[in-house]
Amino acid sequence: MLSTAAYRDVERELGMGPHGSAGPVQLRFSPYAFNGGTVLAIAGEDFSIVASDTRLSEGFSIHTRDSPKCYKLTDKTVIGCSGFHGDCLTLTKIIEARLKMYKHSNNKAMTTGAIAAMLSTILYSRRFFPYYVYNIIGGLDEEGKGAVYSFDPVGSYQRDSFKAGGSASAMLQPLLDNQVGFKNMQNVEHVPLTLDRAMRLVKDVFISAAERDVYTGDALRICIVTKEGIREETVPLRKD
């Protein structure tokens, strides 16, 4: 049986007065929403892969099953964004506008490293009201080697060989650490990562993530960046 103090706590949480009458209730507005989704990027010797699922959800509702989170920026650069879908769209539009301005001014496309530095300044400029987005950039650098850049919401970034972000990142990152980075492993030969093995690995980890993460699923969109350009591949995932 609840004590008098416990009843008062319940009344206070429900906004009820001392005699059960409804009291004033404060409604809170949040400018953010989490729309789920997972992005991943892997860099090889002469290629880079950026992949994401296509599910767009909120809570227990699926808004659409065909919303890929990989956006082509140039012929050598792709960005993966997950988090709040509204911020993802806004941020990618700003980046695309900056890239067009740069190309018109310099008669050439911005490099992958320069795009990463530009994105860092954009995110830092919004540090007091940040974009709720997990950003990963994948592409080729000036020497034609694969490059991956990962960001936090306020602009701090670093170059990696592989990175996962989004709702299933806690499941994907340990697999990448083990299979790509060979971390915490003894007597293992560090063989270079081939494109075929990287593709198989990306498909396997996303199939596993879709089994465990309710916000990841429906389909897998893979963008493969090579010196020939960018090609896309779609793989079905579970839809429940």
Curated annotation (Swiss-Prot):
One GO term of the biological process aspect: proteolysis involved in protein catabolic process
Positions bearing N6-acetyllysine: 203
Modified residues (N-acetylmethionine): 1
Subcellular location, principal: cytoplasm
In-chain residues carrying the UniProt-annotated modification Phosphoserine: 61, 67, 161
Keywords tagged on the record: Acetylation, Cytoplasm, Glycoprotein, Nucleus, Phosphoprotein, Proteasome
Ranges in a coiled coil: none
Complex formation: The 26S proteasome consists of a 20S proteasome core and two 19S regulatory subunits. The 20S proteasome core is a barrel-shaped complex made of 28 subunits that are arranged in four stacked rings. The two outer rings are each formed by seven alpha subunits, and the two inner rings are formed by seven beta subunits. The proteolytic activity is exerted by three beta-subunits PSMB5, PSMB6 and PSMB7. Interacts with SERPINB2. Interacts with RFPL4A.
Function: Non-catalytic component of the 20S core proteasome complex involved in the proteolytic degradation of most intracellular proteins. This complex plays numerous essential roles within the cell by associating with different regulatory particles. Associated with two 19S regulatory particles, forms the 26S proteasome and thus participates in the ATP-dependent degradation of ubiquitinated proteins.
Record-linked PANTHER family: METALLOPROTEASE TLDD (PTHR32194), PROTEASOME SUBUNIT BETA TYPE-1 (PTHR32194:SF2)
Name of protein: Proteasome subunit beta type-1
Organism: Mus musculus
Lineage of the species this protein comes from: Eukaryota, Metazoa, Chordata, Craniata, Vertebrata
